[in-house]
Amino acid sequence: MKKKVLVGMSGGVDSSVAAYLLKEQGYEVIGVTMQIWQDDEEFIEKEGGCCSLSAVADARRVANKIGIPFYVMNFKDAFKRNVIDYFVDEYMEGRTPNPCIACNKFIKFSSFLDKAMAIGIDYVATGHYAIIEKHNDRYIIKKSEDDKKDQTYALYNLTQFQLERTLMPCGQYKKSKIREIAKEIGLRVHNKKDSEEICFIPDNDHGRYIKNRFPNKVREGNFVDKQGNILGTHKGIVYYTIGQRKGLGIAFGKPMYVVDINPFRNEVVLGDLEDLLNTKLIAKDTNYIPFDTLKEPMEVEAKIRYSQTPSKAIITPIEDGRVRVNFHEKQRAITKGQSVVFYKDDLLIGGGIIEK
């Protein structure tokens, strides 16, 4: 009897080819687009985003083309609670969240998987560029064949339970090959542009998004230097992130960067590039893939943002499941709320959320 797999289809080329590859491998494939948009007007406005009307139409067209059933499943309440509300709360607290990591943790590999299992489906699948393998009795995640498209940074939260029930067929291919396969089988999405924006903020203006929803919470405040001297007025702390130089709306005669955000005083602290360089951080909410807990210091390569090349570091377990990370070289703009992710060569070790 064929194993059943529910494929999360965004209307993009990766998830489309993932569905095709799994069907070719002999699975009984069902395509699903997750409804996460919060109202109909928003849905129509997001033309081109991964949760827009055109995205659903693209996914449905692909499903018809490759001969699989297709459904839209409603995840909007879970998405609002676990991704949008978290996103807004983090910015209000002066931190910079990563909504894709939250979505993977709480929606794609939790709510979506739960729904799949509830209806008797064996696996869920996505178009992520990562490789899941079983070594002895443990599932591991390795970097994808395509270094430039590798998405393991956003997958460090996956549990053994989730990995056992998850398929990522695109991880074995380069992006160019995925596009080639899509073209060969006649998918119109073969040359569709990759989505790079936050899916629920297609114009990428997160400050305006939060201000529109919570106008009373976003207040002007002071830009200050490290000594607390007032330098000017900011639009609201949600508009800024650590390391930001452009868009401050004020000229200082020299480059100035956001080096800290104080939500209690509603202040944005500005400083020099040197003030952004650091070798240490502490991360919370950690998860490890090849083992359950980190018991002793470990040499790894670590990165503090998605697009960064990993740097050598030592990770040391501390209280409450936290981890101390000491980099060999100074890192620029270590940002609270973002994730730090650990590797050994191409093996994903784990990660956590930067606390300080």
UniProtKB/Swiss-Prot annotation:
Enzyme class: transferase
Nucleotide-binding is among the record's keywords: yes
UniProt-annotated location(s): Cytoplasm
Region described as Interaction with tRNA: 149-151, 305-306
Main location: cytoplasm
Cross-referenced InterPro entries: MnmA-like, MnmA-like_C, MnmA-like_central, MnmA-like_central_sf, Rossmann-like_a/b/a_fold
Residues annotated as site: Interaction with tRNA: 128, 338
Domain of life: Bacteria
GO BP terms, alphabetized: tRNA wobble position uridine thiolation
Residues annotated as the enzyme's active site: 103 (nucleophile), 199 (cysteine persulfide intermediate)
Reactions that this protein is recorded to catalyse: S-sulfanyl-L-cysteinyl-[protein] + uridine(34) in tRNA + AH2 + ATP = 2-thiouridine(34) in tRNA + L-cysteinyl-[protein] + A + AMP + diphosphate + H(+)
Amino-acid positions noted as binding ATP in the UniProt annotation, renumbered to this chain: 8-15, 34, 127
Record-listed E.C. numbers: 2.8.1.13
Pfam families: tRNA_Me_trans, tRNA_Me_trans_C, tRNA_Me_trans_M
GO cellular component, one term: cytoplasm
Family to which the UniProt record says this protein belongs: Belongs to the MnmA/TRMU family.
Role played: Catalyzes the 2-thiolation of uridine at the wobble position (U34) of tRNA, leading to the formation of s(2)U34.
Name of protein: tRNA-specific 2-thiouridylase MnmA 1
Species, as recorded: Clostridium botulinum (strain Hall / ATCC 3502 / NCTC 13319 / Type A)
Taxonomic lineage from the root: Bacteria, Bacillati, Bacillota, Clostridia, Eubacteriales
Gene that this polypeptide is encoded by: mnmA1
